[in-house]
Amino acid sequence: CATKYPILMVHGVFFRDFRYLNYWGRIPAELEKNGTVIYYGNHQSAASVADSGAEIAARIREVLQETGSEKVNIIAHSKGGLDSRYAISRLGMAPYVASLTTINTPHRGCEFADYLLNLIPKKQKNAVAAAYNATLKKLGDDNPDFLAAVGDLTASACRKLNEELQDPAGVYIQSTGSCLKHASGGRFPLNLTNRFVHLFDGENDGLVGEASFRWGEAYT
């Protein structure tokens, strides 16, 4: 199905847009086969919502300049949905975005993330963050910030974000999501985290509770 505007696909946290390892599986190829023009966010894998949102805003401008299109449609997964909302509502991208579709995005955050960040001592958190940041830098991030990325996924941070961001008129926003029915049915590490997340967030995909998925005019 050819679309009027190109599609910008925005990945979630701790992933990159690699040429030979597609984050989105077979979805882009199927869309392109039917005439859709696909672009990728090409943003860092671990950064605050504000920093990632700025990268997405810059990427939108690049796509518009390259294609001559007036707008883009955004499909965003996980934290990418928060990053895209920030770009649209805070950074002036609303006139250039026709629609935003979020997939398993923690719009209301993850209570489990609050619990972990409050439980783990600062010294241990910094050690884990340093290890992740070193790895992510090798994978292509210029300035990875593990703690900023995780911190912005907490329920407390998302409550504040939702108070600050107003969905603009003129951008169609919809959401979708899926949950693991059985922990054994998920891939590592989601099969391990599913039961723990359930204690705090109910039905979930291994990281994000279903109650957080819904945002916008339609939810499926």
Regions inferred by a protein language model and the residue ranges of each:
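Short amphipathic alpha-helical segments and helix-helix/interface helices
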Residues: 27-28, 88, 97, 162-163
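Solvent-exposed loop/turn segments at secondary-structure junctions
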Residues: 12-16, 44-47, 79-82, 105-109, ...
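Short aromatic-enriched loop/helix-cap "lid" or pocket-rim segments at secondary-structure transitions
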Residues: 21-22, 110-116, 184-190
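Hydrophobic/aromatic beta-strand patches that form the interior of the parallel beta-sheet core
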Residues: 8, 39, 101, 174-176, ...
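Serine-dependent carboxylesterase/thioesterase catalytic core
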Residues: 11, 38, 54-157
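Active-site catalytic motif of lipid deacylating hydrolases and related acyltransferases
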Residues: 2-72
